[in-house]
Amino acid sequence: MAKSKNHTTHNQSRKWHRNGIKKPRSQRYESLKGVDPKFLRNMRFAKKHNKKGLKKMQANNAKAMSARAEAVKALVKPKEIKPKMPTGGSRKLSRLAYIAHPKLGKRARARIAKGLRLCRPKSQAKASTKAKPPAAAAPAAKGAQAPTKAPE
């Protein structure tokens, strides 16, 4: 008995990709950002059937939006703009307070000290290492090679 052709998978992917990858619905119509969803739904049908209806709907909607904006403008009183004080210095002060704190600043102080050690000039670093007397050499392990002096 022949297999039924109802459940075909032939050329399905081509059919799926024929329309391309679509944008999300919210991003599809860039010119209609502030439009109500009912209008967008109607627009789908209008696009299929008649472009004239679509233009009319768009014009009416634009009129309604502008009228609404004007009404809102009339109702809402403009507020007085208060001058803002710059807040640049407070961060520096709070950082210093954090470092000076006996418990919280412990790690911060250690990190700063480490940075200072690493950034110290080479001549100063050498002077600090030479000041320490060299430790006595530990007895060599059995079978270990004796250290050789590098020629100077």
From Swiss-Prot:
GO-annotated biological processes: cytoplasmic translation
Protein location: Cytoplasm
Biased composition (Low complexity): 121-152
Keyword Manganese appears in the UniProt entry: no
InterPro entries reported for this sequence: Ribosomal_eL29
Gene Ontology annotations for the cellular component aspect, listed alphabetically: cytosolic large ribosomal subunit
GO molecular function, one term: structural constituent of ribosome
Modified residues (N6-methyllysine): 5
Segments of skewed composition (Basic residues): 1-26
Residues modified to Phosphoserine: 31
Disordered: annotated span: 1-32, 119-152
Keyword annotations: Acetylation, Cytoplasm, Methylation, Phosphoprotein, Repeat, Ribonucleoprotein, Ribosomal protein
Domain of life: Eukaryota
Modified residues (N6-acetyllysine): 33
Subunit structure and binding partners: Component of the large ribosomal subunit.
Function: Component of the large ribosomal subunit. The ribosome is a large ribonucleoprotein complex responsible for the synthesis of proteins in the cell.
Family classification: Belongs to the eukaryotic ribosomal protein eL29 family.
Name under which the protein is recorded: Large ribosomal subunit protein eL29
Taxonomic source organism: Bos taurus (Bovine)
